[in-house]
Amino acid sequence: MAGSALPLPPPPPLSLQSPSQNQTRHSSTFSPPTLTPQTPSIRSRLSKICQDGNPQLARQLFDAIPKPTTVLWNTIIIGFICNNLPHEALLFYSRMKKTAPFTNCDAYTYSSTLKACAETKNLKAGKAVHCHLIRCLQNSSRVVHNSLMNMYVSCLNAPDCFEYDVVRKVFDNMRRKNVVAWNTLISWYVKTGRNAEACRQFGIMMRMEVKPSPVSFVNVFPAVSISRSIKKANVFYGLMLKLGDEYVKDLFVVSSAISMYAELGDIESSRRVFDSCVERNIEVWNTMIGVYVQNDCLVESIELFLEAIGSKEIVSDEVTYLLAASAVSALQQVELGRQFHGFVSKNFRELPIVIVNSLMVMYSRCGSVHKSFGVFLSMRERDVVSWNTMISAFVQNGLDDEGLMLVYEMQKQGFKIDYITVTALLSAASNLRNKEIGKQTHAFLIRQGIQFEGMNSYLIDMYSKSGLIRISQKLFEGSGYAERDQATWNSMISGYTQNGHTEKTFLVFRKMLEQNIRPNAVTVASILPACSQIGSVDLGKQLHGFSIRQYLDQNVFVASALVDMYSKAGAIKYAEDMFSQTKERNSVTYTTMILGYGQHGMGERAISLFLSMQESGIKPDAITFVAVLSACSYSGLIDEGLKIFEEMREVYNIQPSSEHYCCITDMLGRVGRVNEAYEFVKGLGEEGNIAELWGSLLGSCKLHGELELAETVSERLAKFDKGKNFSGYEVLLSNMYAEEQKWKSVDKVRRGMREKGLKKEVGRSGIEIAGYVNCFVSRDQEHPHSSEIYDVIDGLAKDMRGDSFLTTLPTVTPSLELDE
């Protein structure tokens, strides 16, 4: 058994020449003599050839030896490892076991082979070597034990819980443990998430009078950062300072200490460590810049970046520029982005692809997707990341059609779609509510057998937004409890809310809690709109309390959702209180509050908050302008609204969308300036060919009794009716005819709707009782007590038809009610 070969997989193809080719090439300098293991210079020659980076020549020399000794086997194995060919090193070990069973392996053989196993992460081979050394090597040295520990640490993953103790067992079997063994053990505990134990073992090492090395601190600092104790961090860092310059000047230790304090949220201490470092390399600079970026100290990160590139002592690398690009992206300032782009271009003869990709991301996040596309088009060479970056930029900026076209072009250019491309495709399908593209993408995933983390949540979200909630439900139920992660639960909750199934929203939320899946900010932000839909402030308050207990109420998305919920539920005072208590505000928070003011007819407050938002340095986006224009419309602030509309185009360079045009049309129509609204829409030309825009105009005609204009608008709307359900507009026109008692016209409209197969959308009502939501649809029979409910309704209807009740009713004009 001891002499059996390793169970090795086939090696990857060598990027080396065949022996015959090499023999020809080196014929002038090398002709293998007849060698024996006793040739004095053979080991040194073999070692020298490997050191010179010519492992193929070393192999030819080794193959010429009839019976290599253990020392020569060790030399060739180590030589191939040093030349980054660990797979081939393992093959030499296997060959040694097969062809030279009587050649004894020593400590160097095993330690070298175990190193090759660690580098290839070949656990099966590593275990085989472990068995070999147990059978063949009676007294393993510390070098072998250290290599064995390192192999297991490298090959085992954190989830391999059944082999948690194997590293510890090897460690405990060592008679004399040096600092290398302790370091490996500490790193293993950190890797497997046992950070407290890692810190404890460091303390035991100190008590055993084993002096820690710089690597000891590099390994233990990440464990200290997880402890959330700055006091403990100060103790470990203070110990490192006491040990002297060898540790203080070690730049890996410095970088690790900077990261440790940053993870604890103590940025000032990170900066103190950085400033105390006299000789810094680029890794130390990058670590400190990265700390600033990750903690949103964006101005400081850019200042430090400028200081780094201005230093004559160091040369900035790609990571430095990537970190700076991330900072500029987060600041979302296009002008700063342009300056950074120009600066980077001056510092590189030819920009590396990775930096060009980061420039595309930067422009995209600054809201200048056309600049991103310009960078993309200027690239001489693109990789799959370049294509995915540009596709994602289009989708994230609302240019979903352009993103889809680029996917098609990407395939034409010979690039394969990966999971990142698929996520962009699914997002585009969700945004466009395009179920066909979504289904095709889903089918592609199934055909290609592609699986990636979060795939189910993307699919559920896509089908939900496309109105195919039943398919979403099937995917959710088919996944099983074990496979459902937090994102999957959130997608299903959000899907039910978006499709108006509020009772199922709360049902899934309860099941989520029962399965001990901890809700996060996305969960709460997804479920709060359901409270708005049923108008339940009490249920909203319960969720507000839940978010406070879970420390989620100050999350910017949860805070915005709470403001929105209270506003839509009619509790505008609660919405104001929530807004004022929110410490961190972004454009979403402001937009939600502005929208709330608008819905409650508080247009002046909405405009005041809009101005306050601008003064605070938060740039309003397209949605913010929709909110403030809506507020002006609801409050009749026409002049103010038109002024803001012009400001949007000229100052913020935001191109109006159909929603902005609808706001202006509605704004003019509400105050009776219907003809002016009509001229505005007509003047838009091709941009005005939007059903919602003309539908808004039709609503204004209904409000002010402009029947003649309504007929003109209806004719225009009919041109948009390409198999879509525009029953709402038809009903509106029919009701106008009914008010004018033009019954023939009413009948004509109804007949036309029936011929088209149009139906009035069914009304849906909900009521929350004792924490449970009961939903009702017109003529619904699904409720278990529907017969009793309809009996009560019939009784109420009879009472309402009584003489005493009818005398209190005003005279009304009949309106169109279609059969459901």
Swiss-Prot record:
One of its GO terms (biological process) is chloroplast RNA modification. Gene3D superfamilies: Tetratricopeptide repeat domain. Its main location: plastid. The keyword Ribosomal protein does not apply. Residues 771-801 are annotated as: Type E(+) motif. InterPro entries: E_motif, Pentatricopeptide_rpt, PPR_At4g14850-like_plant, TPR-like_helical_dom_sf. Residues 693-770 are annotated as: Type E motif. Residues 22-42 have a biased composition (Polar residues). It is found in: Plastid, Chloroplast. Residues 1-50 form a transit peptide. Keywords: Chloroplast, Plastid, Repeat, Transit peptide. One of its GO terms (molecular function) is mRNA binding. It comes from the Eukaryota. Residues 1-42 are annotated as: Disordered. One of its GO terms (cellular component) is plastid. PPR repeats lie at residues 69-99, 106-136, 141-177, 178-212, 213-247, 250-284, 285-316, 317-347, 352-382, 383-417, 418-452, 485-519, 520-550, 555-585, 586-620, 621-651, 657-691. Belongs to the PPR family. PCMP-E subfamily. This is Pentatricopeptide repeat-containing protein At3g22150, chloroplastic.
